[in-house]
Amino acid sequence: MSIRVYLWWNSLLYSSMNILLINDNTEHLNWGAQATVFALRKMFEEHIPAISLDAIPWNWLRREYRQVQLPGKLKFTYQRWRHNVIAEKFLNRISSSAEFFPAIFDDFDYYADQWMACNADPEAADFLRRATAADAVVYNGENSIYRNTVEGCRALFLLWVAKTRLHKPSAIINHTAHLDNVQPRMPAMVRHLFPILDVVTCREPSGWRQIKGMGIDHAELVPDAVFYLRDTIDGNEAFQTWKQAAGLEGKPYFCLSGSALPASEPRSVWDGKVVELVRRLQKFGLHPVLVAKDPDCLFLEEVARRTGGSFFGPEHSFHEMWPLFRGASFLVSGHYHYVIAAASAGCPFIPLSVNNWKMQGVCIHLEWQRTEPFDVTDLGSCMPELVAEARRLLKDREALSKALMARTERLCEESVLNAVRVREMATQGTTVTTYERR
């Protein structure tokens, strides 16, 4: 049965299902984050009959507000304005920060009561309206449950409101939980919120084990949603145009990207270790393609200049990652979703360290021979081993490519559980309607 027939048949059996998705990363400055929400939308549409999807964007979760005290007890609240330095300095002198979200778990109930009483964020009423109209509230946990991120803490609070005040079926899916080695504010939020959620899916093994170790027994290990896209993304036309302009037709190349951690970038007469690494890899007779979307990785454009390489920059769409990596001999990267796209396209990879255990997790998922990433902050020490790893990948590329594509096909099938669990939750209703107020 084709997917279209399947959806038509199920639409006859199910009424419309309204899902409120928190954390739409479409406008995020990261290709992987953009690909995540694209994949989730595609997955939901294909596996949840008659779905109606409402979404709260990532930047909504990061908005800052300030208040000006007016005569009497009146206050004027406005969204922080950053477009003019002089104007912002003046406004900051006559205003104070307006806090509408809790910073720690102990304050969740106080702020939830304020929200329900309409004494909160100017957008609180809008969120409550949209959450009330939804059959279920789902938080896309991409890029947030670590480092006490503002958007992560706020999204957890929104789930708390949806679950404990509005009694909505609620879920967090597709997330990495890395609650160690940070100022510990998130662990308490997770410890109290996750047990009362209807669905919790973790996308990599280490985060899943940590969540399970906190007593959250119903948490499930489900591969990242981007695996669902496989190598089916249509970015070929735009990529081919760039490839011809870059003079890469018929030229063997490798790709290298950065990481969320800082790397040794070129400065003045200092080339830095990234340039040195690229030059070492060029000795295999390959043309370097430096890949960067995130602002912190744009130094790779200078690396491309110094090495005679090509720069694949932020003007490109995430859709073009698949054809880019499909033609590469290998990828060196500390970006989680770049590795997923590369593996799906049959491109072997060399993992670089990041600021959490995502990279180790994707290596385990892919049953990759090397699960310990190379330290991107100490390339000078690990460069000989990294170059040897590149030599191994080149030697065994064909076999490695076939193994990666077979494995990602399996992970694609398993990733659908993100949508299946949301569908079951919204259909069956919430399993927890009360909680012990502290």
What do these predicted regions represent?
Residues 8-438:
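Active-site anion-handling motifs in enzyme catalytic cores
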